Design a protein with these regions (language model features):
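Acidic, proline/glycine-enriched N-terminal capping motif
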Residues: 1-40, 45, 174
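Cytochrome P450
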Residues: 40-51, 223
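Conserved, structured C-terminal
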Residues: 53-345
Length: 345
């Protein structure tokens, strides 16, 4: 099943709710379209992020990491909408990878060949009614299958059987961690702290700081929560930015060789703060770092203060060698680190 919360909103006119809550222009979304978005408090600080799917003219589904029922209900006062928490009723299975479409076409009544990136369609999978969205958390070609909880195991078994010829394997969040970092995708509670959970202002982030400029549509009409703060940040520039960081491999080799060791690479992504320095002064930190099996590089999602977030900036990242804290050279890069050509085809 999925680790995220799911909420349905419907009614004679539920469309105004999401344009009020999110910086995305949800009014423009067609039926069958999915939009990724963050949402903010009044100060433009992120509370959560997820997707809005327009399943019908007046039917929307929101996914989020945190329970959102109360937040939606508070903002829907006076609107003619019904908001329902469906996390326990709807299961979501994520099928990701270059062969995901081929596998789905084996077990679905309707072909997935025409389903575009970030679109959603009703289908039948192994005899069970499902909704399939071309979305995911890996940065690869992939789909998420939305099903009644009672049918989830049947659908899982059908997918495992259909994918057997292609070496399909179950995958947990720690494996997905490596893929999501390669794809430049951040995670709540790891790469940013929800504004309503932060102890101090410095722990909060804005969608512009998190690189979601493309999802903050300030040209859309009307008010949305956090709009004024985000307009101010857009004109003044962001104090911090989420960027990529590539560690120089030879620099790491030298640091480990000084202790008579080959470079020690963690077998999974490291969720933890690692300082980034310039000339001995800390200018930011890594929030998730990992060895990239695809790129054969040690990479990290990093938060950097202005002006150090410009691509190409040479910095040092803290690494530990034999219980000693040392600093490996590296450079700031744009995200994503990797995007396969077939992802959006």
């Amino acid at each position: 099943s999925s680790r995220f919360m799911k909420t349905m909103t419907e009614g004679p006119n539920p469309a105004p709710l999401f344009p009020k809550l999110t910086p995305r222009d949800v009014h423009k979304m067609a039926v069958g379209q999915v939009g990724y978005t963050g949402w903010c408090d009044e100060d433009g600080k992120m509370l959560d992020d997820g997707t809005v799917s327009r399943l019908g003219e007046n039917l929307f589904r929101l996914t989020s990491a945190e329970p959102s029922l109360r937040w939606l209900s508070m903002n829907a006062v006076g609107m003619d909408v019904t908001i329902t928490e469906v996390t326990e009723q709807v299961a979501a299975l994520s099928l990701q990878g270059p062969k995901s479409r081929t596998v789905l076409n084996r077990v679905c009544a309707k072909s997935l060949d025409k389903l575009k990136y970030f679109r959603v369609m009703p289908n039948t999978l192994a005899g069970k009614p499902v909704t399939i969205s071309r979305t995911g958390y890996t940065g690869d070609l992939g789909y998420e299958i939305w099903i009644d909880v009672a049918d989830a195991l049947h659908v899982w078994d059908a997918l495992m059987a259909a994918g057997n010829d292609y070496g399909i394997v179950p995958c947990g969040i720690l494996a997905m961690d490596m893929a999501r970092v390669e794809a430049g995708l951040f995670m709540i509670d790891v790469d940013y702290t929800a504004a309503n959970h932060a102890w101090i202002e410095g722990q909060k982030s804005t969608p512009l700081e998190m690189g979601l400029d493309w999802a903050v549509q300030l040209d859309k009409p009307g008010y949305f929560v956090g709009r004024r703060a985000l307009e101010r940040e857009k004109s003044e520039g962001s104090a911090w930015k989420l960027m990529g960081f590539e560690v120089d491999w030879e620099s790491m080799e030298r640091l480990f060789a000084a202790s008579g060791l080959p470079p020690q690479i963690p077998g999974m992504a490291v969720r933890g703060s690692l300082p980034l320095l310039l000339g001995g002064n800390q200018v930011g930190y890594a929030s998730t770092s990992t060895w990239s099996p695809v790129l054969k590089k040690y990479i990290a999602l990093v938060h950097l203060q202005r002006p150090y977030y410009e691509p190409g900036t040479q910095l040092q990242m803290e690494i530990t060698v034999e219980h000693k804290r040392l600093h490996a050279n590296g450079k700031v890069v744009k995200l994503p680190f990797y995007e396969p050509e077939w992802k959006k085809k």
